[in-house]
Amino acid sequence: MKTIVGNVMPEETRMAILEDGRLRDFAVERNDDMHIVNHIYKGTIQNILPSLQAAFVNIGRRRNAFIYMGDMFPRAASKEEIQQMHLSVGQSVLVQVIKDEQGMKGPKVTANISLAGRYAVLMPTVDYIGVSKKIRDEEERNRLRRIVSEIKPDGMGLIIRTVAKGVSREELLKDLQYLLGTWDSILQRYKRSRKPTLLYREADLVMRMIRDHFTADVKQVVVDSREAYERICQVFPDPAWRSRVRLYEGTVPIFEQYAIEESLTHLMSRIVPLPSGGNLVIDHTEALTVIDVNSSKYTGNGSTLQDTIFHVNKEAAVEIARQLRLRDIGGIIIIDFIDMVQPTKRDEILQS
């Protein structure tokens, strides 16, 4: 079972997900205006860069946002259609942030808007129906698709999230109506605004974590902020859900109480131990991340050499996925597993 743990401080908020007492996911957000991913703005085209097929957009912040032409028009548009569409300096645009400011670079934005709800993601500019790949039951996928096709407005897209598995038509419709109301409010503010401005602010880390991860397999949500606790309870009036939300009032800091602080310290280490005695060595360069798998002290306890290697590699595959998620590592990743002779064993490692 999972536990969601929240540590809310004046400077920053930290959220963690534990699975059987072990750190599975972690996120941190500073309590300032620097994190703006998924915020929606009214912007003005400031400068067009034909050679890059891109433009700079004034969204009312200290640095202009950057947008590729391919992100300026609906995803359904073809290359030919995009080339025929005309942009001009001073033109107003409705954009959503997809990447925060970094160093001297402004945020990256798109005109393909998406609004996340509890059960669904609304895409107002694209006609599309999708169901999360994590819902694998074909009968359930078909049921959800039928419901979406009945309730989705023409010309808009709706993606059903994993947490929607098993929910009723009424619950999905209620979530959609909330998202449509939010979208209508954004459009009204866009029409009224005379200059670049913020139109919609994405939920903070606490509420995003609850929205995205508070599912039936979560045993408890524990936060050390009364304000955050009360906000979560307001979202879940059902006593069955609310009973799983708890305010932590202990004297020991909450991340120490749940041994999360110790786990976070290990995330700073280059060497990651494996349960068997093997280890991972994680190295970063400017271009890529390299992960080396070592058997180290593990001898296999009487197993054959190939069985020993397979066991270490299988442990490593699971732990590597966990480390990539916790360390937020992306881009090019090279993994050097211990050599295996049998192709079937190699395939099994890839599947794990």
Where are these regions (language model features)?
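DE-rich acidic low-complexity regions and acidic surface loops
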Residues: 1-352
